């Protein structure tokens, strides 16, 4: 409970914002348009994925399973959080009036963490899958690859949900954020707030860093095979180039959208003197920066499906005609196998 002398739940902090200021900041039309575009983009990507998964190889089916999990996560994230935010912007209700017990705030905090961290963890899982598929093509049974991919997606969801539930167990707190239309982790100086903020930002940052490292090795391996001595006979298949292009696009989008928010959270909870006063108040500058970084991060849910839609072979062939003229039945796996045998 914040020392504000009221009987409100622990999710309410002093924000000192007027109704007129909320109307200027919280536009229901912008929020609704943002959600509609995002939901339509993810539905389009899911429909394209449904067609692409028919008749594909085991390796490609495994990768498409991860993509399906990623797009589904983005779609559900926009649907759940968008419903709450658009409703608040349209009605301009006072959060403490409709949710004095903080149940809705805690729910939104959990889903914000869950749907924020899941795409980053899925990106790292996809990078690991492609790294093993390119550098160790025969290290895992192909028949079980799709089943294992779904199991990995489920494990990622479970890990993200477990992290999101920590504030309900006393590690960190979820509070209503400026301008009073959403809930997120608390950027306070208490040990639980600091630990939870650092854990979220570090897991997200490590996921992006791992994706960058593994994707760099995978691309370097593909380039080595492409320009090797046997390049004329054994080049990467179109599907392998397509998957790496999509994965690199997902990594770039995640880095641009999420790293600013993750760095801001870590810097704010470690700030000395603390950014939050003992009464639970942040400076208006800090509150606005958090809102801006959060809005940038939410663009990840719109851009992810378009990475898959635009980086398909049908589009890549228009940009690089050589993809449609060279043999498509050859793979880089024989050359990688030959190299490993020589070692």
UniProtKB/Swiss-Prot annotation:
<feature type="topological domain" description="Extracellular">
    <location>
        <begin position="271"/>
        <end position="289"/>
    </location>
</feature>
<keyword id="KW-0472">Membrane</keyword>
<feature type="topological domain" description="Cytoplasmic">
    <location>
        <begin position="312"/>
        <end position="343"/>
    </location>
</feature>
<dbReference type="GO" id="GO:0007204">
    <property type="term" value="P:positive regulation of cytosolic calcium ion concentration"/>
</dbReference>
<comment type="subunit">
    <text>Interacts with RPGRIP1L. Interacts with PSMA3. Interacts with RACK1; the interaction regulates TBXA2R cell surface expression.</text>
</comment>
<dbReference type="GO" id="GO:0004961">
    <property type="term" value="F:thromboxane A2 receptor activity"/>
</dbReference>
<feature type="topological domain" description="Cytoplasmic">
    <location>
        <begin position="220"/>
        <end position="246"/>
    </location>
</feature>
<protein>
    <recommendedName>
        <fullName>Thromboxane A2 receptor</fullName>
    </recommendedName>
</protein>
<dbReference type="InterPro" id="IPR008365">
    <property type="entry name" value="Prostanoid_rcpt"/>
</dbReference>
<dbReference type="GO" id="GO:0005085">
    <property type="term" value="F:guanyl-nucleotide exchange factor activity"/>
</dbReference>
<feature type="topological domain" description="Cytoplasmic">
    <location>
        <begin position="53"/>
        <end position="66"/>
    </location>
</feature>
<feature type="transmembrane region" description="Helical; Name=2">
    <location>
        <begin position="67"/>
        <end position="87"/>
    </location>
</feature>
<dbReference type="GO" id="GO:0045987">
    <property type="term" value="P:positive regulation of smooth muscle contraction"/>
</dbReference>
<dbReference type="InterPro" id="IPR000276">
    <property type="entry name" value="GPCR_Rhodpsn"/>
</dbReference>
<comment type="similarity">
    <text>Belongs to the G-protein coupled receptor 1 family.</text>
</comment>
<dbReference type="GO" id="GO:0045907">
    <property type="term" value="P:positive regulation of vasoconstriction"/>
</dbReference>
<dbReference type="GO" id="GO:0033574">
    <property type="term" value="P:response to testosterone"/>
</dbReference>
<feature type="glycosylation site" description="N-linked (GlcNAc...) asparagine">
    <location>
        <position position="4"/>
    </location>
</feature>
<keyword id="KW-0325">Glycoprotein</keyword>
<dbReference type="GO" id="GO:0045766">
    <property type="term" value="P:positive regulation of angiogenesis"/>
</dbReference>
<keyword id="KW-0597">Phosphoprotein</keyword>
<dbReference type="GO" id="GO:0005886">
    <property type="term" value="C:plasma membrane"/>
</dbReference>
<dbReference type="GO" id="GO:0007189">
    <property type="term" value="P:adenylate cyclase-activating G protein-coupled receptor signaling pathway"/>
</dbReference>
<keyword id="KW-1015">Disulfide bond</keyword>
<feature type="topological domain" description="Extracellular">
    <location>
        <begin position="1"/>
        <end position="29"/>
    </location>
</feature>
<keyword id="KW-1003">Cell membrane</keyword>
<dbReference type="GO" id="GO:0001669">
    <property type="term" value="C:acrosomal vesicle"/>
</dbReference>
<keyword id="KW-0675">Receptor</keyword>
<feature type="transmembrane region" description="Helical; Name=4">
    <location>
        <begin position="150"/>
        <end position="172"/>
    </location>
</feature>
<feature type="disulfide bond">
    <location>
        <begin position="105"/>
        <end position="183"/>
    </location>
</feature>
<dbReference type="GO" id="GO:0006954">
    <property type="term" value="P:inflammatory response"/>
</dbReference>
<dbReference type="GO" id="GO:0016607">
    <property type="term" value="C:nuclear speck"/>
</dbReference>
<dbReference type="GO" id="GO:0009410">
    <property type="term" value="P:response to xenobiotic stimulus"/>
</dbReference>
<feature type="transmembrane region" description="Helical; Name=6">
    <location>
        <begin position="247"/>
        <end position="270"/>
    </location>
</feature>
<keyword id="KW-0807">Transducer</keyword>
<keyword id="KW-0225">Disease variant</keyword>
<dbReference type="GO" id="GO:0071222">
    <property type="term" value="P:cellular response to lipopolysaccharide"/>
</dbReference>
<dbReference type="GO" id="GO:0007186">
    <property type="term" value="P:G protein-coupled receptor signaling pathway"/>
</dbReference>
<dbReference type="GO" id="GO:0007584">
    <property type="term" value="P:response to nutrient"/>
</dbReference>
<comment type="function">
    <text>Receptor for thromboxane A2 (TXA2), a potent stimulator of platelet aggregation. The activity of this receptor is mediated by a G-protein that activates a phosphatidylinositol-calcium second messenger system. In the kidney, the binding of TXA2 to glomerular TP receptors causes intense vasoconstriction. Activates phospholipase C.</text>
</comment>
<dbReference type="InterPro" id="IPR001105">
    <property type="entry name" value="Thbox_rcpt"/>
</dbReference>
<keyword id="KW-0812">Transmembrane</keyword>
């Amino acid at each position: 409970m914040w020392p504000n002398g009221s009987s409100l739940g622990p999710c309410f902090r002093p924000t000192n914002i007027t109704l007129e200021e909320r109307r200027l900041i919280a536009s229901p039309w912008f929020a609704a348009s943002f959600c509609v575009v995002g939901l339509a983009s993810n539905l389009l990507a899911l429909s394209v994925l449904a067609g692409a998964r028919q008749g594909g190889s085991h390796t490609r089916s495994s990768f498409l399973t991860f993509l399906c999990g990623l797009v589904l996560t983005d779609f559900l994230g926009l649907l759940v959080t968008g419903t709450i935010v658009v409703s608040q912007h349209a009605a301009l209700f006072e959060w403490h009036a409709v949710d004095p017990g903080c149940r809705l705030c805690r729910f939104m905090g959990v889903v914000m963490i869950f749907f924020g961290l899941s795409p980053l963890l899925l990106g790292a899982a996809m990078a690991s899958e492609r790294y093993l598929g390119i550098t160790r093509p025969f290290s895992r049974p192909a028949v079980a690859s799709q089943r294992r991919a779904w199991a990995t997606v489920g494990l990622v969801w479970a890990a993200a949900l477990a992290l999101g539930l920590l504030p309900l167990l006393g590690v960190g707190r979820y509070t209503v954020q400026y301008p009073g239309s959403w809930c997120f982790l608390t950027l306070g100086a208490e040990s639980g707030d600091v630990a939870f903020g650092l854990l979220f930002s570090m897991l997200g940052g490590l996921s992006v860093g791992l994706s960058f490292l593994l994707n760099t090795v995978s691309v370097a391996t593909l380039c080595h095979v492409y320009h090797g001595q046997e390049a004329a006979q054994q080049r990467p298949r179109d599907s392998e180039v397509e998957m790496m292009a999509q994965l690199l696009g997902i990594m770039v989008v995640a880095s641009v959208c999420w790293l600013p928010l993750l760095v801001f959270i870590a810097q704010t909870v470690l700030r000395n003197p603390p950014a939050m006063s003992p009464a639970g108040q942040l400076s208006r500058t800090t509150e606005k920066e958090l809102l801006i970084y959060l809005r940038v991060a939410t663009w990840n849910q719109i851009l992810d499906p378009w990475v898959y839609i635009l980086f398909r072979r049908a589009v890549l062939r228009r940009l690089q005609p050589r993809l449609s003229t060279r043999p498509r039945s050859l793979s880089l796996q024989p050359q990688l196998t030959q190299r490993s045998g020589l070692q």
